[in-house]
Amino acid sequence: MYKTFAAVMISTLMATIAAAAQPASTAPPEVIKDLAPTGTLRAAINAGNVVLVQKDASGVHGVTVDLANELARHLGTPIALTVYDAAGKVTEAVKNGEWDIAFLAIEPVRAAVIGFTAPYVIIEGTYMVAADSPLKTIADVDRDGIRIAVAKGSAYDLYLTRTLQHAALVRYPSPPLGFEGFVADKLDAAAGVRQFLNAFAKTRPDMRVMPEHFQEIREAMGTPLGRDAGLQYLKTFVEEMKASGFVAKSLQRAGQADAVIAPAEK
């Protein structure tokens, strides 16, 4: 079965709240049917992105968790959070009907099965290399014989798969395993979210993160394709959360104030 503790989830959090304790929903019935067809809003949380999700002994926190809970409050439904350790696993899980909403970067491959809102946060994808590496710029990396560690199915994996002309990608199950593989397998570079790479490099003075970026990763909310009423509601919800300062305040609480809030969708 695809959904296993070891291969798919870091953990599963059930944050189910009695419906009677929820405020009355102002959402139309067709929206609730799309976003909570079981009566519970099932939210997929990608713990592979440290900008959006932070973990501690009490569970998961961060802007995606805050947005999921706020959406459930708007809908007047209970909520169940399922935590995955990589974005690629969230995308795979939609095929099994495991979630109703997710927080993923907008990518063409994902858009074949997921309807996306406009982004709420924009983060950078870049490279980490050895401190003494001859690779100095983003352009230097795309050369014959260069091997790059990536988390399988991540936004940067999908982007680099489309755009690289010469370098080869070496895929690992999750971002942490990708960085471990980069070191253990003596690869030339590791791709990832800048904040995650910076945190890793701080513990490894023999590593450095490139100041340039190869990708602006547009983080958005999504729902399985075909839930049109639900998607339109999500689009409005995301714009409201950006305009009200909800997203900015959530990121600040999470220690991610340097993340860039996406502009309003025109």
Region roles according to the model:
Residues 120, 129-147:
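Flexible hinge/capping segments at coil-to-helix
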Residues 47, 122-129, 194, 198-239, ...:
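Periplasmic-binding protein-like
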Residues 23-105, 110, 244, 253:
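Extracytoplasmic small-molecule ligand-binding "clamshell" domains
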Residues 40-47, 61, 139-154, 168-169:
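Short loop->beta-strand "edge-of-pocket" segments that line small-molecule binding or catalytic clefts
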Residues 24-29, 62-74, 133, 139, ...:
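Extended ligand-binding regions for polar small-molecule ligands
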Residues 41-42, 76-78, 95-104, 145-147, ...:
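Alpha-to-beta junction loops
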Residues 88, 105-113, 159-162, 183-184, ...:
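A ligand-binding cleft/hinge motif common to bilobed small-molecule-binding domains
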Residues 81-92, 135-136, 170-181, 217:
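Short helix-initiation/N-cap motifs at beta->coil->alpha
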